[in-house]
Amino acid sequence: MKYYLFTSLSILLSIISANAQNGKIIEQKPLVFADTTIARIEKTIPHAKALVNDVDFFKIIYLSDGLKVTGYLSMPKKAGKYPCIIFNRGGNREFSALNDNFVLRVLGEVANWGYVVVGSQYRGNAGGEGKEEFGGSDVNDILNLIPFLSHIDKADTSRIGMFGWSRGGMMTYLALTKTNQIKAAVVGSGAADAFINTKKRPGMDSVYAELVPGYFQNRDSVLKTRSAVYWADKICKTTPLLLLCGSADWRVSPEEQLEMVNKLYENKHPLRFEFFEGGQHSLIEHADEVNHVTRNFLDMYVRDKKTWPSLEPHGN
């Protein structure tokens, strides 16, 4: 009995210790871009060199549930306190992992708007410890970026937003069921119904099978926990959402996102929706518009902390 109590106490203390360490920065290493990388990006983003001149970039390692997890950080070089954005990547494992090219183009762009931007590779990826679960315990790797930001001098942690793309949209929805600290969130081409996803793309079944614990024993249950359309009412109501969707997206069917819009509307969740005609998964054809609406939304509800208007029927 004494041994059992001692063991239980040891486990409890280990958990408490791990939780206390969440977000601790293990490494923050400056990222230097090769001239060839900048030149390549300048073909699509002419101001790439200006981003490098105005924004600091870092590769990071931080603690999440006792695991060393890798990611990236970007922030304006100019002194000051800035609102923050947690960026949630898409893909799985090394597919669509964050890389120097993407970080300069996307995280650098958002940082240049006047934000501290941090993104996780999720556990088990890019040299990180553990194993990702495609919407399981790896959601904590996002949540633990909140205490991570408290260690960044330029970060104003009273103003944190979130921005997720594709699988990162699913991760954003999941994170928003567990925290009310996010002032607003943007979801681009966001996965919201795993059943539609596996029906439209049967190959995704193998991804779930390889990454999701309990998949073979209880497929419907684990897919439902990764399908926000089934628990849209659990998403924090004080976090306004901007959903971006392209009508020609084959990776995440517009059906998923339209269904999610309806569920959010039914639950009177503060919501804005942009549907881009002919837009593919990346919405690259509408890049300028996407940047414009995303920046305006984040500036309004994260930077400026604007209050969402009444959702009840009103007016003349």
In which residue ranges do the predicted regions lie?
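Short substrate-entry loop that stabilizes the transition state in hydrolases
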Residues: 80-82, 87-130
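Short beta-strand/loop motif that positions the catalytic acidic residue
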Residues: 242-245, 249
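Mobile cap/lid helix-loop segments that gate and shape the active-site cleft of serine hydrolases
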Residues: 97-98, 190, 195-234
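Conserved alpha/beta-hydrolase "acid-adjacent" motif
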Residues: 250-256
